[in-house]
UniProtKB/Swiss-Prot annotation:
It holds the Pfam family PIN. Belongs to the PINc/VapC protein family. The lineage of its organism: Bacteria, Bacillati, Actinomycetota, Actinomycetes, Mycobacteriales. GO terms for cellular component: plasma membrane. Residues 4-123 form the PINc domain. GO terms for biological process: negative regulation of growth. Its cofactor is Mg(2+). This is Ribonuclease VapC24.
Amino acid sequence: MLSIDTNILLYAQNRDCPEHDAAAAFLVECAGRADVAVCELVLMELYQLLRNPTVVTRPLEGPEAAEVCQTFRRNRRWALLENAPVMNEVWVLAATPRIARRRLFDARLALTLRHHGVDEFATRNINGFTDFGFSRVWDPITSDG
């Protein structure tokens, strides 16, 4: 099963960024697949970013950002993943000396996805996800898949 990171979804929505066309094309390829899972953690982050004027030049209002996220939630072919019992593992990572603060968000997402059987992850942040047991982590913006 494949899942898609927030950064890919954001670039697909943001026509002002140079990655837009490639990200949007990747989502079009994925739209009809039945082996895609979207995680609520990713959608919550997408909602926040779509509304943030430091991230996008034309931030959305709450209802508009929510509708973007609902569009992904409504894809009948895609699985919708929520939480998983992964926080004990996340807190073990949190206690690791010199761990980057933001690493915990990626860890929680990765462990949640793996708990639900996701084995492939599309992201711009390849290095943040290589240590979690995915069979494939890749950047669909810079590679052909």
